[in-house]
Amino acid sequence: MTVPENAQHTAPDQTQHTAPDRTRQAQQAAPDTAGRRLIELMAGFWKTQAIYLAAESGLVDAIAAAGRAPAVELANRTGTDPDALGRLLLFLESLDVVSGEDPAGYALTPVGELLRTGTQDSMRDHVRIYGSHFYRAWGALDHSLRTGRSAFTEVYGSDLFRYLNQHPDLSLTYERAMVAGTPFFAQVPEVHDFSGARLIVDVAGGHGALLHEILKSCPEPRAVLFDAPHVIAETADRPIASEHGDRVTLVPGDFFEGVPQGGDVYLLSRILHCFDDEACLRILAHCRSAMAPGGRLVVVERLLTRGTGSSLAQGYNMHMLVVLGGGRERDEDAYRTLLEKAGFQLDSVTTLPLETHLMAATLRR
């Protein structure tokens, strides 16, 4: 076809795309987007181990001590290879754990600050146990998938709680990690009224971090912190003992055998999700029989919800399978049914941060 001489030519980069062109481009972009997303999901272990080693190697503490430092200096401080550490720092910068670049050096971001040793809001112990023992257990996910049993037990030859009892250093890390993952504890006494309580029994309360927050806000009640003997032995220098020693009794024991008597409030914070329904009913039965007339039960757990968005509860539901075998997260209806079978009625459900909920229950009439 002959083009008239006076016709205006359209530059190639100004050509208007037709509908088929746009459809073709969208089809080409979709696999790239999906492929990138799949790679990011598949390589999640890159992030886990990078963050774990940033804490475990002393890198984060070295950066904190220097304020800002280049890779070579940080390699000298941590006894690592300068090139390898430089690569790790670049990756951590992409994850928003550190900021900066060489030669000016790297500093910690707010995320990186959470990996420091000994700071008030530190999540270092959380990262340490997830990046080591739990990481190895997840490597045996196929065992849990085939058998429905704990991959942790398969890898370490012992269930988690027996293993912690046999390894005091890890037990201490675990209990500190459990506190590090609970920034919502301070809000519990804000959303639930403990002022009328006379005796609060915290069942399997660890080092007493939740009980500490409750007693700080409510000066009237006395309390019992009840947990395994090796856990109770670790609480001597914790705030629950040092700040509330005259109000708190530390009691070692096994909640499958019984719980301390006479409480009018029994706390179960992130305990029931560790066990199957049968074991939960045993724990709840002991709480019911020990409870003073008119007593109540306070349960803190993540609740499963339906939806396609990101959900910590869905991830922890898998984590309970891998690490504990019989453990599981449950939805509100499942907890209501469980409580009713144990002789309680669910009175209220209150939302807390990190997809956690406080469920208050009383004895059924």
UniProtKB/Swiss-Prot annotation:
Pathway it works in: Antibiotic biosynthesis
Active site per the UniProt annotation: 273
Region of interest called Disordered, as start-end residue ranges on this chain: 1-32
Residue ranges, compositional bias (Polar residues): 1-18
Catalysed reaction equations from the record: 3-amino-2,4-dihydroxybenzoate + S-adenosyl-L-methionine = 3-amino-2-hydroxy-4-methoxybenzoate + S-adenosyl-L-homocysteine + H(+)
Gene Ontology biological process: antibiotic biosynthetic process; methylation
InterPro entries: COMT-like, O_MeTrfase_dom, Plant_O-MeTrfase_dimerisation, SAM-dependent_MTases_sf, WH-like_DNA-bd_sf, WH_DNA-bd_sf
Keywords, comma-separated and alphabetical: Antibiotic biosynthesis, Methyltransferase, S-adenosyl-L-methionine, Transferase
Family in the record: Belongs to the class I-like SAM-binding methyltransferase superfamily. Cation-independent O-methyltransferase family.
The protein's role, per its UniProt record: Part of a gene cluster involved in the biosynthesis of cremeomycin, a light-sensitive o-diazoquinone with antibacterial and antiproliferative effects. Catalyzes the methylation of the C4 hydroxyl group of 3-amino-2,4-dihydroxybenzoate (3,2,4-ADHBA) to form 3-amino-2-hydroxy-4-methoxybenzoate (3,2,4-AHMBA). In vitro, can also catalyze the methylation of 3-amino-4-hydroxybenzoate (3,4-AHBA).
Annotated protein name in UniProt: 3-amino-4-hydroxybenzoate 4-O-methyltransferase
Species in which this protein is naturally found: Streptomyces cremeus
